[in-house]
């Protein structure tokens, strides 16, 4: 199958090897991009683990050399048992005394799978400091993404689910303790194995390994961004038609996930930007052909090949950041508009309730006089011809007067723009006719005295105000 399998001394018939190799080539080149292929393989693996039937197979094209954390020669052939498939993708439990990693040699062959090293021995063998191990050690805690150069020995990479050490002749990929990341890490190892086996040309080994890591990271960022755009975009489109409580709750959940993705993308972009701005780190990343960095030289060394590679992925990551930021702004704008609509509806309900209260108060006051009139007491108007009419008219006038005065007070404290029946804004007229109407008694009864009188300051007061503004002389 591959050299890595022969290194593990697994006896497989040559015909089976040829069939597997041809199938792998067809499987690798039938996809348009790495993202589509990874999504298809992830889907197959998920269906395999969750399907109730026993006919599920390992997705074609996945290297057995990295899927199985505990190799057994008799189990290299794909099996139909879904439990065995799950065990092959089982993550590694963190240990305080050991580190677990898979090693690729300079030809792309896997020389060790999930091999455990004592931490102190591992640090001494790779000329690392204990603080460096925190960035790459197997842990369930997410660490800030980083690419640290330890010239001239290695490059420490910690991006998303990938924690690796790149040397001039080998790559060490550390295992994960998170079950959901184990599958992603397996797909990355498959990509790394394929790319390291391809002809290198003039590209250094460490740059090919670093580019494989960046490709994997960008592919997963792109897939996550696509999911966020589809999910949030659908909810935003639905909220334009109807404001629903469940939709707002879903938008809140997706907004939190989008913010987390945005933060990760920004951190990765900052890592690439720091590398591009630091010539010393760029020089230290040349492990195969070391370059000595001298800051005193006026014309620094040209890192065109490395800068072009990093800049291309920096622009791609920056594009993801911009799209995610734009989507976050759309969500915030939608939230603000929804809040404005809800506040307007709430104020409309409060205004409607106040109007009902005003009318209720008017009718209550109007029935006060008839209540006195209807008492079984002598009021000296029982025999009057106009008594009933006078009481009725006076009660109605009294109720209308209370309603008018109440609406007058309500208009003074009302802050919203009132709408008339036709949907037009009610603006106060500034024409001469409107000013003349304001002087009428019934206009002042409904709307109050709108004329605000200001007394002009005296010359002495004007002088004091002028001195206060200019602060030229102390006040006397």
UniProtKB/Swiss-Prot annotation:
Motif YGMN: chain residues: 373-376
Q: Name one GO biological process term.
A: mitochondrial magnesium ion transmembrane transport
Bilayer topology: Multi-pass membrane protein
- GO cellular component: a single term: mitochondrial inner membrane
What keywords would UniProt list here? Ion transport, Magnesium, Membrane, Mitochondrion, Mitochondrion inner membrane, Transit peptide, Transmembrane, Transmembrane helix, Transport
Q: Where is the transit peptide?
A: 1-20
Coiled-coil segments, which residues?
none
Which residue ranges traverse the bilayer? 349-369, 385-405
Compartments where found: Mitochondrion inner membrane
GO molecular function terms noted in the UniProt entry: magnesium ion transmembrane transporter activity
Record's InterPro entries?
MRS2-like
State the signal peptide span. Answer: none
Q: Per its UniProt record, what Pfam families does this chain match? A: MRS2-like
What this chain does, per the entry, is described as: High-conductance magnesium-selective channel that mediates the influx of magnesium into the mitochondrial matrix. Essential for the splicing of mRNA group II introns in mitochondria by affecting mitochondrial magnesium concentrations, which are critical for group II intron splicing. It also suppresses a variety of mitochondrial intron mutations and its absence may disturb the assembly of mitochondrial membrane complexes.
Give the family from UniProt: Belongs to the CorA metal ion transporter (MIT) (TC 1.A.35) family.
Q: How does it assemble?
A: Homopentamer. Forms homooligomers. Interacts with MFM1.
Entry protein name = Mitochondrial inner membrane magnesium transporter MRS2
């Amino acid at each position: 199958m591959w050299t890595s399998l022969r290194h593990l001394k697994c006896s497989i018939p040559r015909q089976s090897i040829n069939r597997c190799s041809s199938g792998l080539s067809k499987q690798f080149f039938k996809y348009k991009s790495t993202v589509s292929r990874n999504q298809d393989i992830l889907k197959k693996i998920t269906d395999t683990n969750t399907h109730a039937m026993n006919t599920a197979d390992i997705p074609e094209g996945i290297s057995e050399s990295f899927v199985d954390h505990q190799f057994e020669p008799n189990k290299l052939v794909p099996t139909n048992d879904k439990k065995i498939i799950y065990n092959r993708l089982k993550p590694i439990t963190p240990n305080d005394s050991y580190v677990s990693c898979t090693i690729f040699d300079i030809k792309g062959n896997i020389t060790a799978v999930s091999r455990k090293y004592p931490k102190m021995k591992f640090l001494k063998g790779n000329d690392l400091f204990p603080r460096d191990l925190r960035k790459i050690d197997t842990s369930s805690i997410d660490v800030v993404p980083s690419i640290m150069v330890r010239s001239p020995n290695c490059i420490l990479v910690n991006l998303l689910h990938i924690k690796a050490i790149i040397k001039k002749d080998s790559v060490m990929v550390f295992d994960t303790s998170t079950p959901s990341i184990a599958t992603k890490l397996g797909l990355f190892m498959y990509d790394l194995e394929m790319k390291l086996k391809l002809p290198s040309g003039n590209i250094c080994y460490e740059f090919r390994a670093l580019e494989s890591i960046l490709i994997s990271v960008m592919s997963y960022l792109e897939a996550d961004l696509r999911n966020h755009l589809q999910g949030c975009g659908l909810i935003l489109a639905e909220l334009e038609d109807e404001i629903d409580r469940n939709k707002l709750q879903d938008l809140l959940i997706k907004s939190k996930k989008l913010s987390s993705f945005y933060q990760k993308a920004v951190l990765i972009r900052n890592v690439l930007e720091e590398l591009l701005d630091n010539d010393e780190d760029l020089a230290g990343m040349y492990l195969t052909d070391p370059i000595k960095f001298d800051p005193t030289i006026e014309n620094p060394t040209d890192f065109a090949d490395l800068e072009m590679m990093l800049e291309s992925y920096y622009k791609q990551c920056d594009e993801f950041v911009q799209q995610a930021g734009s989507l976050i702004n759309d969500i915030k704008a939608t939230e603000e508009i929804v809040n404005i609509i809800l506040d307007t509806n709430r104020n409309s309900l409060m205004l409607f309730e106040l109007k009902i209260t005003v009318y209720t108060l008017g009718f209550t006051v109007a029935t006060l006089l008839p209540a006195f009139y209807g008492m079984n007491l002598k009021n000296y108007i029982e025999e009057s011809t106009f008594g009933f009419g006078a009481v009725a008219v006076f009660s109605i006038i009294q109720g209308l007067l209370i309603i008018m005065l109440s609406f007058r007070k309500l208009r003074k404290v009302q802050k919203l723009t009132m709408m008339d029946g036709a949907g037009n804004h009610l603006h106060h007229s500034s024409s001469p006719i409107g000013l003349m109407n304001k002087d009428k008694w019934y206009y002042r009864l409904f709307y109050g005295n709108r004329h605000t009188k200001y007394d002009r300051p005296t010359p002495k007061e004007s002088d004091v105000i002028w001195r206060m503004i200019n602060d030229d002389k102390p006040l006397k």
